[in-house]
Swiss-Prot record:
One of its GO terms (cellular component) is cytoplasm. This is Adenine phosphoribosyltransferase. The keyword rRNA processing does not apply. CDD domains: PRTases_typeI. Homodimer. Keywords: Cytoplasm, Glycosyltransferase, Purine salvage, Transferase. Belongs to the purine/pyrimidine phosphoribosyltransferase family. GO terms for biological process: adenine salvage; AMP salvage; purine ribonucleoside salvage. Signal peptide: none annotated. Catalyzes a salvage reaction resulting in the formation of AMP, that is energically less costly than de novo synthesis. It comes from the Bacteria. It is an enzyme of class 2 (transferase). Pathway: Purine metabolism; AMP biosynthesis via salvage pathway; AMP from adenine: step 1/1.
Amino acid sequence: MNLTHYIASIENYPKEGITFRDISPLMADGKAYSYAIREICQYAADKEIDMIVGPEARGFIIGCPVAVELGIGFAPVRKPGKLPREVVSADYEKEYGLDTLTMHSDAIKPGQRVLIVDDLLATGGTVKATIEMVEKLGGVVAGCAFLIELDGLNGRQALGDIDYKVLMNFPG
């Protein structure tokens, strides 16, 4: 199935010169959404994954159904102040400065094998911060899966040697 037909491209959003890749049409089509989730589950099948980790908000939309399908847990990554218990945090670079992500400090047990799932790999800042937190908690990042990679933004460099799966590529 060619999933690119289910991605809307919005020019000059959220600002001039940016093309936003909207996954809403993919989610609105049960067959396409299901296909995308199954593709990620197949990728994860031989990795002995213990936990799915997904950054807010679209990482939840992709990661939760993957976790349910695999019969494992899901750990959310949130912006500061959104999680009620003790957290670990990691800073990452955005276009105009630093931002921070957090996750519960008991979300990952030492030695757990984690699959990080998100909608988009662009510059790699979000996934790099997520990897840092998982490893800080003693987890092992066994792989990453993304619906979309924006080519030319060097996001894959943030992954280092970590294996990853991308379902679609678009120009960055």
